[in-house]
Amino acid sequence: LDYATRILFGHIGLELVEAPFDLPLPAKRLSDGTLRFLALAAILLQPSPPPLICLEEPELGMHPDMIRMVAEMIADASAKTQLIVATHSEHLLTALQDDFDVLFAFDAGLTGSIVRPFSQEQFKKWREEHTLGELWTSGELGGNRW
């Protein structure tokens, strides 16, 4: 996987070059998930990242295999910067279940959101039988729609 840039009619274009094909694909022909993956890679793989990176549903539009790759980039970036990640994805939660310091669940209350923190110690007890993604989809961690 490689990329190329091209200037055409005064505009800079990004093109993706994927093995075994040597034909560059312009960004406008790439899927939304691929474009989002490339944007996340640019953010998370910075050699000198900002002190805080916030990601809102980084899994959107991605195949579960790509979500695992995003989770690896998030885990690696967390060694260099603080990250706040909001997700509704059981795949992302499961892929990150060993790489968080604090987990929060948000539930709807009558006058606003109710925030509940969960520690690694609490999670270790649950982890004996379930993945973090399973706990999320079961409603055990909150975040319920109703």
Question: Where do the PLM segments sit?
Answer:
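Substrate-recognition/cap regions that form aromatic- and gly/pro-loop-enriched pockets
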Residues: 50-52, 65-74
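Generic recognition of flexible, low-complexity loop/linker segments
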Residues: 1-3, 92-93
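Conserved ABC ATPase signature
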Residues: 2-45, 58-65
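Catalytic Walker B motif of ABC-type/P-loop ATPase nucleotide-binding domains
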Residues: 53-57
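Short, well-ordered helical secondary-structure segments
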Residues: 17, 22, 31, 40-42, ...
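C-terminal lobe/lid and adjacent interdomain/linker elements of RecA-like ASCE P-loop ATPase modules
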Residues: 69-146
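Short strand-connecting beta-turns/loops that link adjacent beta-strands
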Residues: 8-9, 19-21, 49, 98-99, ...
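Loop/turn-to-beta-strand initiation segments
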Residues: 49-51, 63, 78-84
